[in-house]
């Protein structure tokens, strides 16, 4: 059987400040494309690994429209099952109760299921597929049948080889998850950038990133979905049709980011001349910044991540 794994949806009708297009219309179009892709590829279910909505305050009209679109997908010729975990954006005040939330209303208005420690089971012609869930802050459950194709949908920060920012601690690497032999597939959410990792024995960690690009920081992100075949245990990645980044974001903001990234790269390259063996490296670095022509925006960023303001002056 085939399963579609999507990224964080962050459904909302609010346009991010640097977007220039009709954001909600784009969100609807991508949502429809995902459902259509699942139907065209005979998927039996779609896994939504958390942050289905952008906030628990999502307007009723958005929730109502998502119920309508989801029902059309569920009631089609194939009858696709939508399976969900919750992210921190889906719940009120960081609790685990989704009942009085947009996600809870979506579940009540459709045949969707909230995944948990008890598996949602597909027979798959005698080759059972068990799908579990671990929402934001929840522990990963123990599978009840090691002979089944066990899949876990989870909302946690999964990264590649390196932290996303200096000092990041609350994460797990995709390689670490691949060492966990309990699950054939980890369908993850939370990280808005794509992370894919696989073994030669066809174990996979899939984090598709966000469906929508909401910030300039996602300059290099390509929205996509993952198609998983439980029989072959193979995955394939498919890009969601989307406009070029410069067509939907403010041009001056893009130019500023590119310029800042370039200056930071130049600064990092210039740091090779700083003696890293000195006892007080932060002080030496601050002195270097004061005696060299370092752009103000680069200085600001360095100060934020190193807390070096105290060395200035």
Q: What kind of region is each of these model predictions?
A:
Residues 9, 16-121:
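Core catalytic region of metal-dependent phosphoesterases/phosphodiesterases
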Residues 5-7, 45-51, 81-88, 113-118, ...:
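Active-site neighborhood of phospho(di)ester-bond hydrolases with catalytic His/Asp-centered motifs
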Residues 73-78, 144-146, 177-182, 200:
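Short, conserved loop/helix-junction motifs that constitute active-site signature segments
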Residues 66, 83-176:
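Conserved catalytic scaffold of divalent metal-dependent phosphoesterases
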Residues 1-25, 140-160, 284-298, 302, ...:
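Mobile, glycine- and charge-enriched loop segments
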Residues 206-270:
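Binuclear metal-dependent phosphoesterase catalytic core
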Residues 166-233:
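Conserved beta-sheet core of the metallophosphoesterase superfamily
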Residues 244-313:
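Non-catalytic terminal accessory segments
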């Amino acid at each position: 059987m085939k399963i579609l794994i999507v990224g964080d949806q962050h459904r909302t009708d609010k346009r991010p400040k640097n977007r220039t297009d009709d954001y909600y219309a784009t969100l609807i179009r991508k949502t429809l494309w995902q459902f259509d892709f699942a139907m065209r590829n005979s998927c039996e279910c779609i896994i939504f690994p958390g942050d289905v909505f952008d906030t628990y305050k999502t307007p009723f009209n958005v929730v109502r429209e998502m119920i309508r679109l989801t029902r059309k997908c569920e009631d089609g010729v194939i009858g696709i099952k939508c399976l969900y975990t919750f992210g921190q954006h889906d719940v009120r005040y960081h609790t685990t109760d989704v009942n009085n939330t947009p996600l809870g209303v979506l579940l009540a208005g459709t045949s969707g299921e909230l995944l948990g420690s008890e598996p949602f089971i597909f027979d798959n012609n005698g080759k059972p597929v068990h799908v579990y869930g671990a929402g934001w802050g929840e522990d990963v459950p123990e599978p009840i049948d090691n002979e089944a194709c066990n899949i876990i949908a989870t909302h946690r920060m999964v990264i590649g080889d390196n932290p996303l920012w200096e000092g990041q601690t609350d994460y797990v690497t995709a390689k670490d998850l691949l060492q966990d032999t309990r699950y054939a597939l980890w369908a993850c959410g939370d990280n808005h950038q794509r992370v894919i990792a696989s073994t030669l024995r066809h174990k996979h960690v899939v984090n598709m990133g966000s469906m929508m690009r909401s910030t300039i920081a996602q300059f290099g992100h390509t929205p996509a979905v993952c198609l998983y075949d439980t029989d072959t245990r193979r995955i394939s990645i498919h890009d969601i049709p989307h406009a070029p980044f410069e067509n939907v974001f403010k041009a001056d903001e893009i130019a500023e980011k590119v310029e800042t990234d370039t200056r930071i790269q130049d600064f990092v390259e210039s740091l090779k001349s700083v003696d890293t063996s000195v006892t007080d490296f932060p002080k030496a670095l601050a002195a270097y910044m004061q005696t060299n022509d370092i752009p103000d925006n680069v200085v600001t960023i360095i100060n934020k991540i190193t807390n070096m303001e105290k060395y200035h002056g």
